[in-house]
Curated annotation (Swiss-Prot):
HAMAP family: YajQ. Gene3D superfamilies: 3.30.70.860, YajQ-like, domain 2 (3.30.70.990). This is Nucleotide-binding protein BP2916. The lineage of its organism: Bacteria, Pseudomonadati, Pseudomonadota, Betaproteobacteria, Burkholderiales. Keywords: Nucleotide-binding. NCBIfam families: PRK05412.1. Pfam families: DUF520. InterPro entries: DUF520, UPF0234-like_C, UPF0234_N, YajQ-like_sf. Disulfide bonds: none annotated. GO terms for molecular function: nucleotide binding. Nucleotide-binding protein. Belongs to the YajQ family.
């Protein structure tokens, strides 16, 4: 039976490249000259360090631009509130990986409401869709692309 997986993943290498490019842009921008502003990547968490909260907002725009230039969907970003102290300001941006349980259930409910003859099941942070016809699976892909989810969805492992 044909099947495919619905995932929400970010390529670690592309993320590293985007953060490196954002750091390079910080070093060349006039409004950040002489400041200790930087991006630091640890796992899937990007930490922004700047002298003020205003500069953090500018840095977030730089990061968004670099992520989209590296074809990473910015909906995967979970931006925390900035932390300010006398030494400067910090802000953590978490890059979301995988489909959470609540969102997976919402996607399954949307698939069932469409009355397409497919089966869907949650496999950890993935969603496996199985159907008898390839056309049904393609209809589900079109449906999932239209749904309003705050995660970028990728479709992989399409088996016939």
């Amino acid at each position: 039976m044909p099947s495919f997986d619905v995932v929400s993943e970010v390529d670690k290498h592309e993320l590293t490249n985007a953060v490196d490019q954002a750091n390079r842009e910080l070093s060349t921008r006039f409004d950040f000259k002489g400041t200790n502003a930087s991006f630091e990547l640890e796992g899937y968490v990007v930490t922004q360090v700047a002298p003020s909260a205003f500069q953090l907002k500018q840095m977030l725009d730089i990061l968004r631009g670099r992520l989209s230039a590296r074809s990473i969907d910015v909906r995967c970003m979970d931006v925390a509130d900035p932390l300010e102290n006398l030494g400067g300001a910090r802000q953590k941006v978490t890059i979301k990986q995988g489909i959470e349980q609540a969102i997976a259930k919402k996607l399954i409910a949307a698939i069932k409401a469409s009355k397409v003859k497919v089966e869907s099941q949650i496999n950890g942070e993935k969603l496996r869709i199985t159907g008898k016809k390839r056309d049904d699976l393609q209809a589900v892909i079109a449906l999932l692309r239209k749904t309003d989810v705050d995660l970028p969805l990728q479709f992989e492992n399409f088996r016939d």
